[in-house]
Amino acid sequence: MNDKEAVVLIGHGGSPADIPRALVAELKRLEGERQARRVLEMSPREAELDKQVREWPRTPATDPYKFGVEEIAAALAPKLGGRRLVTAYNEFCAPSVENAIEGLVKEGFERILLISTMFTRGGIHAECEIPGIVIETRKKHPRVQVEYAWPFDAGFIADFLAAQLARAVPTPKA
């Protein structure tokens, strides 16, 4: 058991089906305006909306994405050699990546490994936001080792996808 290392499984996050669309639309508008100004810190209103959306009650029926990530986490946990595993989300779901990391730091973890469910390059979350969070965490907590297991090898992803095809759609026998 490794009581000094933890893993954060990061999912994109999605808004629950029963949340008022106007709430999410306002959040996305404020986020877009902030990003256009190249400002990192949220306004008080954006932070309030972000918290409200992330903490919205969820069920498998209203947010199958979050429960899908949790299912992956449950399957991944026994494969991590005793490392603690938590989930986090880039947007819409709690906890945020930053909050998940802060919780682990407060619990005394010395090494935190981040891995994303987002496999492809080019996405703002996996390619820009998460590396930015790593940089900020290292500055804030220089004694904590934070690593991001990304990008994924294209050949590895291709093998994974080919295996899934073979499993889900068996080749007919001649």
What are these model-derived regions, one by one?
Residues 1-174:
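Active-site-proximal alpha-helix that buttresses catalytic centers in soluble enzyme cores
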